[in-house]
Every structure is written in structure tokens, then in C-alpha cells.
Amino acid sequence: MTLNKTDRIVITLGKQIVSGKYVPGSALPAEADLCEGFETSRNIIREVFRSLMAKRLIEMKRYRGAFIAPRNQWNYLDTDVLQWVLENDYDPRLISAMSEIRNLVEPAIARWAAERATSSDLAEIESALNDMIANNQDREAFNEADIRYHEAVLQSVHNPVLQQLNVAISSLQRAVFERTWMGDAANMPKTLQEHKALFDAIRHQDGDAAEQAALTMIASSTRRLKEIT
């Protein structure tokens, strides 16, 4: 996808804010300085400010300019913000907070999937599961298949509001999976069995078993995460 100039500046400043170049409470450079630095117009910079405000990374103060917002006000459900934070630094507090969201959301998603999944949905989940099995010693390919698996489960719920959370949930899952992948004989068979158990529960339309399978999967992921942090 080709980015326009506004988008490119948003990404640059957003990443600089998240990385700590501009700390919360400090001011961004003046509008005129940003225009000069990025070789662009005031209208473009004002569009950038509006975008960063929507992500709650900055606050505009009358006659004073743009200031970095406190971290606890940042919009972590904005997929750009979440991805920038996860790319920039491993923050155990953020991972822990988002893992709590997984515990809240994913068991319900699993139950609804068991109640609503179509034959086409089941084929998508099974395809991703088979790719996980086939690539269980290839970290990158395995994690991509794992993400596809969970996305397919979410898609099978057929809830348009939940779909809006899909990218944020996937970003979190990707960050967790990349840090908790363990291809050894002590862990990989258990991981694959947990994913198969969830698929089987969904396939058999067993909501209770699907919910329990999701809880078991999250507990295993959380345990592995704690072991490496």
C-alpha cells in the first residue's frame, strides 16, 4: 500500500513518541519547525496533529502547540499505536494487561464459534491448524499459521463489532506468540494438542469444551510468557 505524505509523517512522529524521543508532557516542535523539517505545508502538519490526537498520543493546548499525552491515555486499541509500542520495546505490563483482555474475550469467542461456525469456517480453521502442524519447527511459518488459526476462529463468530477488534487482537497475539514459541519436544506437542482440542470442540458444536479449551490455551501461553520474563 502506498502511503501519502501525511501518513508517512504520522508514522514517523508516532514512532518517535512511542520510542521516548518526545516524553509525555513535553512539547512537539513548533508547527513551523515541523513544516521545515518534513518539507511540507502547515495544512499537512495540522492533518498529522489531528491523526495523532485521534490516537491520543498528543494533546493540543491553545496558543502553546502539541504536547505528548500521558502513556495511560494512549489508544492501545488503535492498531498503529499498539504495533509501534510492541515493536519498540517489550513491556511486560502491557503484555499482562492485554493478556487479561485475552482471558476476557477469547473464551467467549470460542463458545460462540462452536455455536455459529459454518462448514466453510471449519475448513479455514482446519487449514490453519494443518499448517501449524506442518511447520511446527519453523518459528515464523508456525506463528503466521497460528495467527491465521485464531483469526479464522474469530471470523467464524460472524460478529461485525468483534471484527473491528481483530487487528488489535492479532497484534497482541503476534507479540505473545513470537516470545512464547517453543519448538522443543516438551512444549510443541502440547501446543498443537491444545489447538486441536479447540478445533474439535468447535467442530462438534460443544460450547463448554470450546470455552475450556480456550482457557487452557491462554493459561499455557501465560505460563510460557512468565518463564521468559
What is each model feature region?
Residues 126-133, 148-150, 160-163, 167-229:
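C-terminal all-alpha effector/ligand-binding and dimerization domain
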Residues 91-94, 118-121, 138-146, 158, ...:
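Residue-level recognition of alpha-helical structural elements
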Residues 1-104, 111:
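Short linear motifs at protein or domain termini
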Residues 16, 135, 154-156, 201:
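Hydrophobic side-chain positions on well-ordered alpha-helices
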